[in-house]
């Protein structure tokens, strides 16, 4: 991960701007640079992944035009060769150096030509345009706000803008900002028509496109590792990578000392793949001590995001401190595409698809936010193969009647697509467990118990009543909200709501986001 920061004004000192940039120094620990430009100030913190030489440091300039990008542009080398044939020259092996020439070639339509995850700020000196843009899923974070003097600012994280902007907003996904306006260039969740592929073709395309999504994310000039929970999604990513690389991959799992579900299944997968596997063991004390740090780095008050981030943050912390790995592949975004436990209760195919679209459009506030912050705060880069644009577009084009749980097994199409020698049958067809549960049922119970003892009933009633927006409804949610407000005062509206199952559906009127409370959880998490 890297950090970008831009301010469209000349009333902010370079020293203050640098202090704002350095708040997220862990995103870009290798080097930091602040440039004074025609429009204002532009900053970049580098985590070198592609093109490791000093020439790969941003901002990239061509004349007075400039760009900073926290991103990964997949398949950039053939594009670079085409640009070289057009007469452009390059000084580094960085993928992001091709952005300005691409902009010259395509203009604002450039964003539709990118197979990438990115958050960028670009200045066109000829047109005097300040442009910012974000990828269609929002895998790379970007926020914006306005200073007291009315100047717009863009930043990788909300914490970069605290004190500069009164209100901070998530930059809309699949959109660009130009000349004072936001424009949606891609709604990846929108499906004008479903494809007509038969079942065999559908399964083949699911497999081939996910394999391609993993393969392109193995391209790095630094060591690559894998988060392995032992669940279907992360196990598939690891299995594909192991086949592609043809050598032992490095996998990491974490679990509570008492009842970690993940560790058992992760070891089964690692042994099957002959992986170089590392286990991390945590306990109640470690979890509770990490809680405030986790919420501060996340910038959310959402219950399930915080719960699931604790284990992820701690395993990434271990990887940062004990290995040379810089890139981590993860299994996020499969649930939004193929269904959660609660989507078993979808009343119709239409509602299943609408729910999937909603979840994809909100990913940047929940699972994607969790993966980005938990990994980047530890100076690592997250790559999410299930978020591959070609893969997402295809899966969203599958008739939802096929994706619903009509087979008595969730994610049937994904499982069926990888039958064979990819994974042990016991893993391929294993029921889903919530990540925070899989780390250990006791982890969530420990946090709840702590919150219950932290507030009396009277204190809970008084303190939760202070919040008109998304009022905390349990002592656990109040604990999270109070810590959030300590670090992000008045910014609660960055998150639209608590992540919960669709309460309008049968059997989904629950007040806890964990799949554990659903009546169809069954043997999940055992």
Locations of regions flagged by a protein language model:
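Hydrophobic (often cysteine-bearing) scaffold residues that line and stabilize catalytic clefts
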Residues: 13, 92-95, 114, 199-206, ...
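Short coil/turn segments at secondary-structure boundaries
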Residues: 33-36, 112-116, 167-172, 219-224, ...
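Short, basic, helix/turn surface patches
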Residues: 60, 117, 121, 302-313, ...
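Cytosolic ligand/metal-binding cores
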Residues: 335
